[in-house]
């Protein structure tokens, strides 16, 4: 998206909606498309208690693996976490426009602004 995100898409880059992978330079970590193209599915269950429980341990947690189950007493649908925001973000349903932005989404959701977030471990690089 070109213009003043998220208010004005001028389409100067030729992409009114989705942009092909690697349309923009990698970030300082060598990662592409971490925010703004599509929301990215993660393998994490949406559990409103998980991070509060971690914080209550008063210790540094390195690479938390996420909750074992979904939990939200206000919504009984089982949900996974999506991260990063998309080209369709607006103030009405995007809390922020950053890589760590997260939302709960039904596991059977299929939208053009949902994709996958893949990861690579050091062992996979070797």
Predicted feature locations:
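Cyclic nucleotide-binding regulatory module and flanking cytosolic helices
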Residues: 1-2
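Surface-exposed recognition segments
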Residues: 5-19, 34-126
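Short, small/polar residue-rich loop motifs at catalytic or cofactor-binding pockets
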Residues: 24-27
């Amino acid at each position: 998206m070109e213009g003043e995100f998220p208010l004005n898409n001028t389409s100067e880059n030729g992409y009114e909606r989705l942009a092909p992978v690697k349309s923009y330079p990698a970030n300082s970590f060598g990662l592409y498309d971490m925010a703004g193209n599509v929301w990215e599915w993660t393998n994490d269950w949406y559990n409103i208690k998980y991070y509060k429980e971690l914080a209550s341990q008063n210790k540094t947690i390195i690479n938390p693996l996420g909750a074992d189950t979904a939990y939200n007493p206000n919504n009984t649908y089982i949900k996974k976490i999506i991260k990063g925001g998309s080209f369709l973000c607006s103030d009405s349903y995007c809390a922020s426009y950053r890589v760590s932005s997260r939302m709960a989404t039904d596991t059977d959701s299929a939208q053009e602004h949902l994709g996958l977030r893949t990861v690579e471990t050091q062992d996979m690089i070797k």
